[in-house]
């Protein structure tokens, strides 16, 4: 008897339109995700990886509901795919997060409904028996945000709001190399499996990236904002720990494990995301320019690719920073 609303998902880093404060009673929110197996380019050198994706993107799209709502997901595995797939929602209770009820072989679809009974940002990922790590690091992960019905709050209970929201999915890739030292290119998922798992077992990623590829969120693809705008960043890592840092900025309010029932930490320089979780960080930009948002494991950021940029427009505030003397002879 609850009202129903269908939501069209969008590809990261964007998030589908939503209200920050719930309007009315709980409802059933309907989503549809189609699984796509495809080859993706991992870096500027043209390195390829056989990927498995929700809706064709890495990470998959971010879903947003309010606490008390019901999520009704139709999961589609087209006949053009080769593998069985499912979905485990870390926000869900029972049946392996839904994985036990959503296993679909190519040509099948399943519908899962569960109650969003706690607020926060949560990871979801594919979890087929015997192949979980391979599917997860091959791209099948994303984030779900369950907002409190009255919106975000600080530790004192004052309302917090955001002007923009972006979602960043951090991935560790394990691309095998051929005997000549160059990265291998595989024609299909099955042909990549054994070599990829062998690299995975070294626990040494070939790439550590935001949103599927080196440079996916830099340059022309940078996040955008304006001075005075408050931006919420949802950052998920389905497999390994991460240490996000905004160079030239901060985390004004940070839910490091993403759970909005817990008070946010204030004025963070770097925050910690345990593998298998999603954090939420809110920052109001105070200066224009190009910011770097990266993992402060700097080797992963600068050598393996775990970095993004934010391009911020507006007027410079000399009170916050000024050049007293330009570089010159000593």
Swiss-Prot record:
It is found in: Periplasm. The keyword Oxidoreductase applies. Keywords: Copper, FAD, Flavoprotein, Metal-binding, Nitrate assimilation, Oxidoreductase, Periplasm, Repeat. The type I copper site in NIR plays a crucial role for electron transfer from pseudoazurin to the type II copper site of NIR, which comprises the catalytic center of NIR for the reduction of nitrite. Cu cation 2 binds at residues 90, 125, 296. Binds 1 Cu(2+) ion. The Cu(2+) ion is held by residues from each of 2 monomers of the trimer. Nitrite is bound to the Cu(2+) ion site. Pseudoazurin is the physiological electron donor for the Cu-NIR in vitro. GO terms for cellular component: periplasmic space. InterPro entries: Cu-oxidase-like_N (IPR011707), Cu-oxidase_2nd (IPR001117), Cu-oxidase_fam (IPR045087), Cupredoxin (IPR008972), NO2-reductase_Cu (IPR001287). GO terms for molecular function: copper ion binding; nitrite reductase (NO-forming) activity. Homotrimer. This is Copper-containing nitrite reductase. GO terms for biological process: denitrification pathway; nitrate assimilation. The gene is nirK. It comes from the Bacteria. It comes from Alcaligenes xylosoxydans xylosoxydans.
